């Protein structure tokens, strides 16, 4: 999908860019049977307390039900449309199966309307097809990857992301993947993945341009701690501009903000990570 640039008719339009939706999308009307209501929570939990900051005030939108499990085995389908999804960075494709059922999937790069797709161990190694990792050859780029067999995809779902199959364990239980971040990790060979790279890779190059576009997406301003009151942030308070007054920068909750590992070392999946993304960059 190409980028569209704007003339500097206003300060907000200067340097602004957006995705040219007319280049790849085939319809602007979603499938009604696959829509559901998406409630606004504005970052609050069931008690009304803010659990996620900087959220609220977005535009109304419907949620598209996406097939992350890809468990419709040995039933071929045809790509009917490629559509915009306001709930994610990637585009989605509407698949019509020969038994009459319709499902949305993430649209990989180079997926075309009218193309046939399938899922299951016997599927061909073609863009859009979903197979167990054990059936996919080394060097293949995949996305929409499960962490537990049958639980639905959790990894590699954002626009432009990918993972590449590097090899297998000696017993064949695990498949070794290289992620776009540089991380190498093992995943059970019985987990499913979809062939190809997630489309809409230019999404990361979009220049928002003005604050209003983020407000439409439900992103509220991020305020510096140093301009808050002392009861709101450890950096707050003082007359005029003041230094932090602490040995190191702190989070709003009083924990060290720089150089502290946040991943739980006792997390069970740590043993499956062969090389972290930070080690790869060294």
From Swiss-Prot:
Segments of skewed composition (Basic residues): 263-282
Keywords: Ribonucleoprotein, Ribosomal protein, RNA-binding, rRNA-binding
Keyword Ribosomal protein included in the entry's annotation: yes
Top-level division of the source organism's lineage: Bacteria
One BP annotation, GO: cytoplasmic translation
Pfam entry (one): Ribosomal_L2_C
Gene Ontology MF terms in the entry: rRNA binding; structural constituent of ribosome; transferase activity
Region named Disordered: 215-282
Extent of the signal sequence: none
Subunit structure, interactors included: Part of the 50S ribosomal subunit. Forms a bridge to the 30S subunit in the 70S ribosome.
Function: One of the primary rRNA binding proteins. Required for association of the 30S and 50S subunits to form the 70S ribosome, for tRNA binding and peptide bond formation. It has been suggested to have peptidyltransferase activity; this is somewhat controversial. Makes several contacts with the 16S rRNA in the 70S ribosome.
Protein name as it appears in the record: Large ribosomal subunit protein uL2
Protein source organism: Mesomycoplasma hyopneumoniae (strain 7448)
Gene name tied to this protein: rplB
